[in-house]
Structures are given as structure tokens and as C-alpha cells.
Regions:
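C-terminal beta-sandwich/jelly-roll accessory domains of carbohydrate-active enzymes
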Residues: 157-184
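Active-site core of glycosidic bond-cleaving carbohydrate-active enzymes
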Residues: 1-153, 158, 182-183
Length: 184
């Protein structure tokens, strides 16, 4: 999982892995591999490992907070549709209003923060930057009341659709897969 922990420079990680195609294939493999694990480090099966098996999303273990940004990395490799697919899969399959509708544990609010950001349609892959990676908005309309007194409104034509056809900011087309904090 720590292979993907280059939050500050995904482009360098892509280059180290041989480019966009190889990087995307490596990301794909995380979701495709059988959920096999080695518990020798812990000496027992910890809950994150058991949850990874139950979730049936390959080796992606959403309950392990350091990997939660991983689906958003497809944005950097030219496969944004895969970000949208996997982010929505995680929201739909791993979160619900049931007693067991929350995987993993809540380390300083990270797991719930992932959901809140992702449901709004963006996520801060690198918390130390001013960029948010675009995902797949879950709501038809979200209003953010910012501390500067401004309100940002995010609308989705149909929250049932997980793929983004076009993104506009103040009626101007946005061709990138990121928003800056200043844009919000």
C-alpha cells in the first residue's frame, strides 16, 4: 500500500513506474488481485485485513487510511473515468446507514472525511497542496459556505451517473481533473 504514498508528486511515481500505461495497469492490479495477505508482521489477522477480504475489491483496503487516496491517482495517468468508477464503487459498497456500514476505524476523522469530500465530488490527495482531485459527485447539489463569506455550489445533472462528461466553473469549461482551493 505504501507504494502509492507519493501524495506530493504522483507524476514522479508515474515516471518511476514507466509512464501512464504501466502506472494505470499497476493501479488496476490492486483492484484485480485476489485479497490474499501475509499476517506475519502482526502475528494475527487484523481488522483491516479481514475487511479487505470481505469488501472483495482485490488488495484495495479502504480501512487502511494511507491507501484511501489511491482511486484518485487515475486522474494523473489519463484514466479519470477509472477514478470516477472506483470512487463511486467505494462509496456505494463500503458506506451505508447500517450498523456495519462503515469499514475500518476512524483515525482522526480520515475515513469519514474521505466520504464527505468524495460525495461532494473532489478530494485533497495531497493535503499540503491547494489542489483537489475530481471524483464522482454523489449529490445533485452541494453548497459550501466558506470562511471568506462566499458560497460555492456544486451541481450534478444526475447523481445516478458516476461519470463526468463535462465540468464547468463559473460557466467556463474546466478541462483538467483538478480544482484549486482558490477556485472553490
Amino acid at each position: 500500500h505504501y507504494t502509492w504514498s507519493v501524495f506530493h508528486n504522483p507524476n514522479a511515481l508515474i515516471a518511476l513506474m514507466g509512464g501512464n500505461k504501466a502506472f494505470t495497469a499497476m493501479l488496476d492490479s490492486v483492484f484485480a488481485l485476489p485479497p490474499v495477505f501475509d499476517d506475519s508482521y502482526y502475528g494475527q489477522v487484523i481488522h483491516e485485513i479481514r475487511e479487505m477480504q470481505i469488501m472483495n475489491m482485490g488488495n484495495y483496503a479502504h480501512g487502511n487510511q494511507p491507501i484511501q487516496h489511491m482511486p484518485y491517482l487515475y486522474n494523473w495517468s489519463g484514466a479519470a473515468w477509472k477514478t470516477q468508477y472506483w470512487v463511486r464503487e467505494v462509496m456505494d459498497r463500503l458506506y451505508s446507514a447500517q450498523p456495519d456500514g462503515y469499514c475500518g476505524d476512524e483515525d482522526n476523522g480520515q475515513t469519514s472525511a474521505w466520504y464527505v469530500f468524495s460525495a461532494m465530488g473532489f478530494y485533497p490527495v495531497c493535503p499540503a497542496s491547494n489542489e483537489y482531485a475530481i471524483g464522482s459527485p454523489l449529490f445533485a447539489k452541494v453548497k459550501l459556505h466558506l470562511e471568506n463569506g462566499k458560497t460555492t455550489v456544486i451541481t450534478s445533472n444526475n447523481p445516478q451517473w458516476r461519470y463526468i462528461k463535462a465540468l464547468t466553473v463559473n460557466a467556463t469549461p474546466n478541462k483538467s481533473h483538478w480544482l484549486t482551493h482558490q477556485t472553490l
